[in-house]
Structure formats: structure tokens, C-alpha cells
């Protein structure tokens, strides 16, 4: 990890099973002995800033504030003190809650991790090794359905209409009181009987508040017509008029003209693979061609595909390992590797991993492909400095929600003070235009060594770490 993921052209025999089986023998050094290496690595990719949205959701706490504002509206209604501002406070927190939910929805989080153990030995001419590795590659996302999004938006619109109607009704009542509307109604009734408009009635013709009353009444009617698209207004009006005699705000769902789900819930989607590999690798120098080493790894693979969706409110972490969402496959496969030392300073490496292409079906009938992965590398060593460059010749198919990738890796290692090795690198995804820098340090002696690696790319929200120990005999 620390050198950008390089290791195909030049690496210790303890890494051969994972990078290039030909490196079980080091042609330029004739490395001999036995090495044991436990390792652990993890990488998290959050390109859509799901974690940032999650932190904001928790900090903003809009859902709880929505609940509080709704309870406040119910209390005000039950005491005949409900005002439009109470309803608008509900719509304000509802909009914030909706925006926070949208900040979580459909933003995949990709995680990969591995751990295992390798054992290798070399006599300087041939080499072999065994390894066991457990690794998981997958991704997850939370999705708020389009129907639920529409429900939230409709609810906000309805509450805004109710608030506007309250304001409009209040304005109409105030105008009616100003102009003495009850008296005006009486004068109109008298004129209807006598057929003559009295002078008092005629005095209302130019009254400045009559026109605003008419306009406010028309607007109130328009709002009522718009609200009628969502509610059975006659029944709702009767319920609202009895507000002071009820303990609870009317259940608006009872008056809707359309059906809704009982609960608002998001769906969690997870997909990926959980793989156990057990392999044996062999390598040998080719006497007829100086500097050339060939190697192969034969491996048994047990692969569990993970593919499920579940309601977020009912989800628990134990379901990640629930076998009802997994489908197990077994296979034999192999890696082929070549290592060639041009001279004491330059080395070339080529590896093809998983030479047998396979397709695996998930429990939901989807397909996950395992195709061969070819990688070419070159390394240069001089004194205390090592430089490496490697390129994927094939595309790595995505196993979770991440896109397909093809990497160019660059790395450097400097052997410094007291056997410490300082490493740095960068891994560039030529398929998607992203890059991830890395760094690390190794220290120890010929019999034992500890390597630490870190990769972080704030621009693309990617972070990872690795640790491995090596004992030589």
C-alpha cells in the first residue's frame, strides 16, 4: 500500500503470493531462507460524501426537531391557539429533515478489507509458499424511494396550504369586521326585498376595504380549491372546527384522497463478495535465460456473494453475516507470474491473476464477474533508493457500488537511518481520473521487520491503512 500498490516487479518473497508468484525467488539476489508474514489492511472509499452527510444528519437532528414542532402544533391546536406560524415551523423542520435525508440517499460507501498469513521459502534457485487470505469487497447505500420523496414534498405543500388558509381566513375576518360585514349583509337583504339600494348601502360602493375583502376572499377560495386536491375538505373542516373539544390534532391521513404507506422508511442496499483464498505458489529460475524466473500460484477459492435490501428501521449489523442474503461458490484458479532482471539495477515483472474467468450469481439473481487481471511493472534500484512503476493491462471489475478501475501505480522507497525504510507512492485510476497518494515506514532487522502503510485522498474521500510483520529464518 505504501508504495502506491506496486510489488509486481520487485518485492520480498513474503509478498510473492499476493503480488507475483515468480518473486518467490529473487533472481538478482538469490535470497534464501524462510519467511512468515501476517498482514492486515483496510480501505474506505466515500466519493459521494456519505459519511459527511451522516455526520450532518446526526448534528442537525432535524428529525427530532420536526417531532417537537409537530407536538407543539398539536398542543396549540388542542387549546384553540393554533396559528400559521406553528404550522410553518413544522414545514421548516420538515424541509430540513427532507434535505438531510436526501444528503444520505443514494450515496454509496465502499469498503474493502483483508487479513491473512503467508509462509515462503527459497533456496536461491527455486522457491515456494503457501498463504491463506480472507478479504471482503463491497459497498452499501441508503435509498429513499421516489414515492417517499413525493410523500414528504406533498406533506410540506399541504402544511404550507393550511398555514396560508389560516392567514387568509384571519385576514378576511379582520376585513369583515372593519367594514361591518354583518350590517352590509342586512342592507343587501333589504335591497333585495325592496328592489332599491338604500343610501347607506350605496355608501359602501367606494369603501376602500371592500376590494381587499373581495381579493382576500378569492385567494382564500383558490387555496381551498388547491387543498381540495389532497383532502376531503368538508370532513376536515368539521374536524378542525371542533379543535377546542379534541385532545389531538386530526389525523390528516384519514382525510387524504390518496393512499400512503403507514411508515416512512428508507432501504439499505448492500452488495459485494466475501472471499477466502488458500493457495500454494511455486517459482523457479530458468537456467537457460539468465535473470528470468517463472512462478505460479494454485489456489482454492470460497466466495460468498452478498446482495440484499432491507428497511433501514429494521436493519441490524447481524444481518451482514446472515446466510439468507448470501450465496456460496467454490472454485479452483491460478495466477501466473514472470520476473526478469535486466541487470543489477532494473527488474521487470508481469502477473496474470485469476486466469480462469468466472461468473457468480447472487441470491437475488444478479451477476458478479471474476475476470483475469494482468499487471506489468518495472523497478529500478540504486544504492538506498528503489523506484517502481506498474500498470494494469486489464480493467478491474467493480464488486460493490464503485465503478470499474484500471490503475497506474508509482512508488519509491528509501533505505535510511538504522535499517528504516521510508516509502511513498501514488495510485492513479486511469479509468475514472482519480488518484490516491500513500506513504509508509518499515523498520527492524534481518530477522524481523514491521511495515506500516497509510493512504489518504481527501479530495476523493478515500482512506486506508495496512500493517504487516515479517519474520525470517
Predicted region positions:
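Outer-membrane beta-barrel biogenesis signature
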Residues: 1-34, 462
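Loop-centered beta-sheet repeat module
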Residues: 297-360
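A subset of solvent-exposed loop/turn segments in beta-rich extracellular surface proteins, enriched
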Residues: 26-319
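Outer membrane beta-barrel transmembrane domains
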Residues: 339, 345-473
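Extracellular loop and loop/strand-boundary signature of outer-membrane beta-barrel proteins
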Residues: 102-105, 263-269, 318-325, 361-366, ...
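Transmembrane beta-barrel domains of outer membrane proteins
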Residues: 22-25, 116-122, 131, 279-285, ...
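Transmembrane beta-barrel outer-membrane domains
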Residues: 106-114, 271-275, 325-333, 367-371, ...
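Flexible, solvent-exposed coil segments and beta strand-coil junctions
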Residues: 1, 89-99, 254-263, 312-320, ...
